[in-house]
Amino acid sequence: MARIAGVNIPNNKQIEIALTYIYGIGRTRARTVLSAADIACDMRVKDISEPELERIRSEVAKFLVEGDLRREVTMNIKRLMDLGCYRGIRHRRGLPVHGQRTKTNARTRKGPAKSITR
């Protein structure tokens, strides 16, 4: 197994798919990284040489991935909550942030339904 950005990449998958195991890299960014490193997208990880892996590592290092990206997202949400803006309040209350309805649905975000006893 190759190791890129602290993540073990599966050997028997195509490199384009294998790169998506890294948090912050999807299919489009994987293609961008591979084209910049001059590597074919349909190669298997086990067929890639060490110099090619180094080129991929250097390209991936240019992006914010894994722990740094998670920290950045967490800090952005925390900043919104500290500002007290609408989105921050919605995050704080555990409600949907992007304008979805909450009279019905939104159970994933709000948690299990609380029964009202009379």
From Swiss-Prot:
It comes from the Bacteria. Keywords: Ribonucleoprotein, Ribosomal protein, RNA-binding, rRNA-binding, tRNA-binding. GO terms for cellular component: cytosol; small ribosomal subunit. InterPro entries: Rbsml_uS13_C (IPR027437), Ribosomal_uS13 (IPR001892), Ribosomal_uS13-like_H2TH (IPR010979), Ribosomal_uS13_bac-type (IPR019980), Ribosomal_uS13_CS (IPR018269). GO terms for biological process: translation. Coiled coil: none annotated. It holds the Pfam family Ribosomal_S13. Residues 94-118 are annotated as: Disordered. The keyword Phosphoprotein does not apply. GO terms for molecular function: rRNA binding; structural constituent of ribosome; tRNA binding. Belongs to the universal ribosomal protein uS13 family. Part of the 30S ribosomal subunit. Forms a loose heterodimer with protein S19. Forms two bridges to the 50S subunit in the 70S ribosome. NCBIfam families: uS13_bact. Located at the top of the head of the 30S subunit, it contacts several helices of the 16S rRNA. In the 70S ribosome it contacts the 23S rRNA (bridge B1a) and protein L5 of the 50S subunit (bridge B1b), connecting the 2 subunits; these bridges are implicated in subunit movement. Contacts the tRNAs in the A and P-sites. This is Small ribosomal subunit protein uS13. It comes from Acidithiobacillus ferrooxidans (strain ATCC 23270 / DSM 14882 / CIP 104768 / NCIMB 8455). The lineage of its organism: Bacteria, Pseudomonadati, Pseudomonadota, Acidithiobacillia, Acidithiobacillales. The gene is rpsM.
